[in-house]
Amino acid sequence: MRLVRSAGWIVPVSLLSFSALSVLFHNTPAASAQTGTPPSSSISSSSGPVSWDFAAVGGGTVTNVGIQDICPPGMCDDHDLTLILPAPSVTFYQTMTAKLTITYTWTNTVPTDLDVFAISPSGADHGPGSPDDTSTGPGIEILTVTDPVDGVWHIRSVAALAPLPASAHAVVTLTTAARPTAPPPSPPAPGAPTFVNYAAPEDCTAPNTPPGCIQPALGSTTASTHGAGEPSIGVNWNTGKAFIEAGNHTLRVTFNDSVTPATAFWEDQRSLFARVSLDPILFTDDGHFGGTNRTFSSQLNGVTSELSFTDDDGNSWLPTQGSGQPAGVDHQSVGGGPYAVPAPSVSTYPHAIYYCSQDIVTAFCSRSDDGGLTFGPGLPIYIFTTVSGVNRPVAPGTCGGLHGHVRVSPDGTAYVPNEKCMDANGISRPGVAVSADNGLTWVVRTVPDAQSISPGSDPSIAAGANNTIYLGYVNVDGHAKIAVSQDRGLHWSKSKDAGTPFGTQNAEFAEVIAGDNNRAAFAYLGTPTAGDTQSADFLGIWHLYIAFTYNTGRTWTTVDATPSDPVQRGCIWNSGGSNPCRNLLDFNDITVDKFGRVLVGYADGCTGSCVNDVSQNATTGPATAQDALATIARQVGGRGLFAALDGTQFATRTGNIVGGGNLCYGDPASGISGGPDCNTH
């Protein structure tokens, strides 16, 4: 059982105190205990199964703390397993796939939870096995590693709970098979949404001038277009100008639709009041629900933010209070929309503007009634209790982990999605904090057929024109799921797997936007590669997929918006810090313009030589495989999110449907139909 950490709560699984653990780490030599029989072995695709016995372990230990060379006898036992592939893994996995399966069993007369971990030659940690639970009598965990690298692995036996020391037995198999080959994406069927991707240009250096490059803003030496992890995006519905914000820069993009394909002119319009960059957030109060097209730029700064706004597309900015108090220390969000009835008696701006942020235990939201200049008090949106000085979640009614971005529906209901919310049975599920009274009170509602993945990424929510809400999330199995509610989250439709047409086995960064009540778009990064996406050894190739519904979520049309250009090769890290696979940071963003055209702002982690070089990945580099280039995927064909504009090609009347897409409808329950490759990707 791992030590699970999230911003909402910490679940300890150790029988050791922290001080004892510190003594252990400082006084124990950096060596692995190897007292099992035998202490080492080798396995290949032709060797058949190998097996061994682990020595007895007990007493409990903390696992996965980042110190993989310490394995004290009696609490841990290692077995060195040399894995031999027919060819080096970098070349072998271009055409083949493999699975290393460890069946780990034990018997004890008292409740016992033993765990097995597999530590790769590069130090990547896989495990524990499944089921990760407590048993009396016989116990079992099965750990499967997909596409393991060659070299010496440490297979580790530890005890999360073992009042009586227990030995374990391991049987390991290695199977290989030809990697399924998918044909190139089919030409998009008529009506399939299609996209063109616009990457930010390089900084201008003499003698180069825009539009072939981007001129850094006054006072900046760079526009930081390659530092665009966790971007947010907005569009001014009056001028058509798009904004993508990441780091300390607000990039303005002007599209020229008089030519085909449209061209993009990039400018650095950063706010002079964005002095620091911790978490950057941009929000445009666009014309979707009658907004003024005011754009907000927020930079987290301690327990508030440096917030400013522009009413002239970034030519000038006005600083504001930043947030109400109290406020959280992480992962802030700015959003807005119509007021719920009854509206405040005094307001000087047509929409409520919300500032929400994650604190150590709960999360707070405050509301502005003057267009973001000042904010009222921050109010907690989750419920916790304190037991013996320790904050504990209350089920139901609380969420842990990091929340997503606040969204407001036409009827004024405010929604803050979260990946880990507890239902009445204490099960952690994706859910949403809901306020129907302009942020004064909140209630948490969960999706009953969803289950949280850890570590995960933010879910996303959006409301249609008649208040139907769409919640996109990554499920416990790693799949991209989306659920629909027409009563503010009291009841949900059965979640649909948007990645089915392309065989998506792992997804990250769910982002949702809606238009007409029955239309929505769901963007996510996905890969058909199974396995642990947090592992340094993960070799998945990630693309940007966007699913559309035109019938309130009954069926979805999924397209690959980056069919010939991966967004990432390798792992995508979700646990903070400076891991090399955290180049994309925590999320992407999505919006819609006044023509119903969907735009997705994302960081491209695989650029230049990485696009075609299969040996590159985010773990080992080079820099082209660890990039975060500001990029916009802009819809150029197919039906958008407003039925009134169907067939106009977003008012350009070009009829252009150039792009990559695969028209596929349905899910496993209702059946898949569409293009010839719908079931082969």
Where are these regions (language model features)?
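N-terminal secretory signal peptides that target proteins for export/translocation
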Residues: 1-7
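Bacterial N-terminal signal peptides
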Residues: 10-26
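Short linear Ser/Thr-Pro motifs
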Residues: 19, 130-136, 562-566
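Boundary at the C-terminal end of the N-terminal hydrophobic targeting segment
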Residues: 30-33
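Calcium-regulated, polybasic anionic-phospholipid
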Residues: 112-115
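Noncatalytic accessory or regulatory domains flanking protease catalytic cores in secreted, cell-surface
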Residues: 117-171
